[in-house]
Amino acid sequence: MSHKIMAINAGSSSLKFQLLAMPQGEMICQGLIERIGMSDAQVTLKAPAQKWQETLPVADHREAVTLLLEKLLSHNIISSLEEIDGVGHRVAHGGESFKDSARVTDETLAEIERLAELAPLHNPVNALGIAVFRQLLPKTPAVAVFDTAFHQTLDEPSFIYPLPWRYYSELGIRRYGFHGTSHKYVSAQLAEKLGVPLSALRVVCCHLGNGSSICAIKGGHSVNTSMGFTPQSGVMMGTRSGDIDPSILPWIALREGKTPQQLNQLLNNESGLLGVSGVSPDYRDVEHAADTGNHQAALALTLFAERIRATIGSYIMQMGGLDALVFTGGIGENSARARAAICHNLNFLGLAVDEEKNQRNATFIQTENAVVKVAVINTNEELMIAQDVMRLAISETVTLGIPA
């Protein structure tokens, strides 16, 4: 039996969605409402053979959700709201409370709101999206899917920071990790494509985009990941610095009189590829600048690759070897240059990339005799969310090959 499942990603001023037919995973419709709260909000809906765009005022998220449901009806995507069998919501932070996705209840929603102190930019609007859908579709089961849940299998040496213990025990400061939904989906897809149980593999997954994170996956479980207490830490990103010497921050604060909020702006929005290149946070723009002789742009590309290489190396040490390296995300899926730079001169690991396969974005890009598989796999977080709705709310398991 086919079920219509909606996957929702609510941002501070946007609402992204997909409506999927499950368990087959076919996209029925997808769309985005941008500039929520403005008089010129952009509404875009796409079905396999059609596209609709409109500009109109959208006051808030409740109005956005109402508009979305109205558009699905008016464009005959669905004939009634009762056709929507379940809704899955992406939630940024589940803290230590959620080790898996969870059915939405009053208690679940309250805990998501409480965890807003760990993700003040994301959890409040995620909770708002859940609340609005519950009001408008009160009989439709909902599931919260947490970016952090996949990383709850990290052991203490991998998640504890070397700070006074009370900062963990009282304030919950620890490595949480993010992009978990993507890492979980891509690693399962890898195992399926290899025809090998995920439980038998040691994998490093590189989710590379404007936000980037690396994840070590052993036996199907996350054992380490580069993002930490916040999505700011780890490798260099589009506008985020990733890991730096922490004493730089008080030094800058004293020298330039910056507030904590200004320092956060510096680290999150003015650093990374943009900060070093002085050109753009977009990897493609930095590539172009580097090719026209811009030294800072070329340096930014080198830094980006070297930080990732160092992280991969540490994870290989932790897992005692490597069976597969996987690239996903906007840069990981589309930039042959980035993949080549990250995999350069790793023959000593039994890892080598075939240039022709890499240039055409083949699924497997390793050379014929390479020991380590190198894969390029498109992530699909919306499908992963829909699969969790099926598993937890519709009581139909979609097999992903992920160990329990």
Curated annotation (Swiss-Prot):
Single GO MF annotation: acetate kinase activity
Family membership: Belongs to the acetokinase family. PduW subfamily.
EC number in record: 2.7.2.15
Name of the molecule in the record: Propionate kinase
Subcellular location: Cytoplasm
Organism superkingdom: Bacteria
Main localization category: cytoplasm
Keyword rRNA-binding tagged: no
BP-aspect Gene Ontology terms: acetate metabolic process; propanediol catabolic process; propionate catabolic process
One Pfam family recorded for the sequence: Acetate_kinase
InterPro entries associated with the record: Ac/propionate_kinase (IPR004372), Aliphatic_acid_kin_short-chain (IPR000890), Aliphatic_acid_kinase_CS (IPR023865), ATPase_NBD (IPR043129), Propionate_kinase_PduW (IPR024896)
Entry-linked HAMAP family: Acetate_kinase, Propion_kin_subfam2
Matches recorded under SUPFAM superfamilies: Actin-like ATPase domain
GO cellular component: cytoplasm
Recorded catalytic activity of this chain's protein: propanoate + ATP = propanoyl phosphate + ADP
PROSITE patterns on file: ACETATE_KINASE_1, ACETATE_KINASE_2
General function of this protein: Works with phosphate acetyltransferase (pta) to capture exogenous propionate and regenerate propionyl-CoA during degradation of 1,2-propanediol (1,2-PD).
Keywords from the UniProt entry: ATP-binding, Cytoplasm, Kinase, Nucleotide-binding, Transferase
Source species of the chain: Citrobacter freundii
Pathway stated in the Swiss-Prot or TrEMBL entry: Polyol metabolism; 1,2-propanediol degradation
Keyword Kinase: yes
